[in-house]
Amino acid sequence: MSLDKIMNEAISPWMKGDGPDSDIVLSSRIRLARNFKKYQFSTMQNEEEAKQIQELFKKEFINKTVEPFGEFELLKMNELTPLQRRVLVEKHLISPNLAGTEYGACLLSESEHISVMLNEEDHIRIQCLFSGLQLSEALQSANQIDNWIEKEVEYAFDESLGYITSCPTNVGTGLRASVMIHLPGLVLTKRISRIIQVIQKLGLVVRGIYGEGSEALGNIFQVSNQMTLGKSEEDIIADLKSVIQQIIQQEKMARELIVQNSSIELEDKVYRSYGILANSRLIQSAEAANCLSDLRLGIDLGYIQGISRNILTELMVLTQPGILQQYAGGPLGPEERDYRRATLIRERLRIEKN
C-alpha cells in the first residue's frame, strides 16, 4: 500500500460493504483510547516524546502483517500536505484533531478498516470501521489490534479505574462506539428532534457526519456512547446496539407513514433530487448531500431502480472539497469545486444506469 493509492482511491473497501441493516445504518465504528505508562499525556508531552512514539511504531509495527488486516503503513502528519491530511479526514481515516497536529501520525491497514492514530488527544487511538450494524465485529478487530500493540508497550492502567485517558469521559474501557445512520424518514416527519432528546437522556451523544461540531449533512447522524467508566465493553456495545435497533424501527415506521400518506409527494421529491443530481452543472456540498439523501431513500423504497444504495456513502465522500481537489491535482476555487462536484455526480450516475 502506498500514499498515492490511499489518496487516489477515495472509496475505502469498508464503504463498499453491505453489512446488516445497511438500508439505514451506513457504518459502525469502534475507537479505543490508550496511553503509554512511560510517557506524559499528549496534551503535556514535548516534541522529543512525540517523536519517540512515532519511532516506536515505525520500528515495531511497520511492514508487519496482522491477519486478516494485512500490512500497515505509517503516515506522519508533518510529511503530508494540508490537502492530503484533509483527504484522510474526509475518508474518515483520521480525526480533524489529528490532522492539525505537528507530530501526529496514523498507522493504517491495507484495507483501511483499521487506523491507529498516534499523538492525538491520547498516545494512541485505535479505530475500526465496518459497514452496516457490526459493532461486535468492529470491537473484536479493535481488541485484536490492541493486544498486538500491548505486546510491545505498557499501557497506563489503574486497577480500580481502568485505562487512564486524557479526557475523563474516556477513563475506564477507553471505548467509544458509534454508528453512522441515515434518518430521512424521521427528518421528513419532523420527529428527529424528539428522537435526539430521548437518545441524549439515555446518555448517548448525537453528532454530524464528521463527529463533534460537524453538521448532519444528508440526514446522516452519528450516535455514540459518552461515558466508559463502570461499564464493560460488552455492556457499552449492547446498550448502543439496543438503542440503534429502536431508532431503526422508528425510521422504518416513519418511512411507511410517508408512503401511506404522501406517496406522490415523496416520489416527486425523490425524482426532483435525482433530476438535479443527473443534470446540474454546478452544485454545492449541502445541496448535493440533501439530494443524495433523497436519492438513497428513493432507492431503498423501490422508486429508483438500477442504482446501488451504496451511492450515498460513496458520493458523500467523493464530493467533499479535499477529495475533489486531490483529483484535480491542486487547490480549486468554490465555483470550480461546485462544477467538478456536479460533473463527478453526473458521470457516476451515468455509469450506474449503464
Swiss-Prot record:
Catalytic reaction annotation: L-arginyl-[protein] + ATP = N(omega)-phospho-L-arginyl-[protein] + ADP + H(+)
One Gene Ontology molecular-function label: ATP binding
UniProtKB keywords: Allosteric enzyme, ATP-binding, Kinase, Nucleotide-binding, Transferase
Motif (RDXXRA motif of the pArg binding pocket involved in allosteric regulation): 337-342
Domain named Phosphagen kinase C-terminal: residues: 24-254
Binding site for ATP: 27-31, 92, 125, 176-180, 207-212
Biological process per Gene Ontology, one example term: phosphocreatine biosynthetic process
GO cellular component, one term: extracellular space
Gene3D superfamilies assigned to the protein according to its UniProt record, in alphabetical order: Glutamine synthetase/guanido kinase, catalytic domain (3.30.590.10)
Name of a matching Pfam family: ATP-gua_Ptrans
Activity regulation statement: Appears to be allosterically activated by the binding of pArg-containing polypeptides to the pArg-binding pocket localized in the C-terminal domain of McsB.
E.C. code: 2.7.14.1
UniProt signal peptide: none
HAMAP family tied to this protein: Prot_Arg_kinase (MF_00602)
Function field: Catalyzes the specific phosphorylation of arginine residues in a large number of proteins. Is part of the bacterial stress response system. Protein arginine phosphorylation has a physiologically important role and is involved in the regulation of many critical cellular processes, such as protein homeostasis, motility, competence, and stringent and stress responses, by regulating gene expression and protein activity.
Similarity comment text for this entry: Belongs to the ATP:guanido phosphotransferase family.
Protein name, as recorded: Protein-arginine kinase
Species this chain originates from: Bacillus thuringiensis subsp. konkukian (strain 97-27)
Origin organism lineage: Bacteria, Bacillati, Bacillota, Bacilli, Bacillales
Encoding gene, per UniProt annotation: mcsB
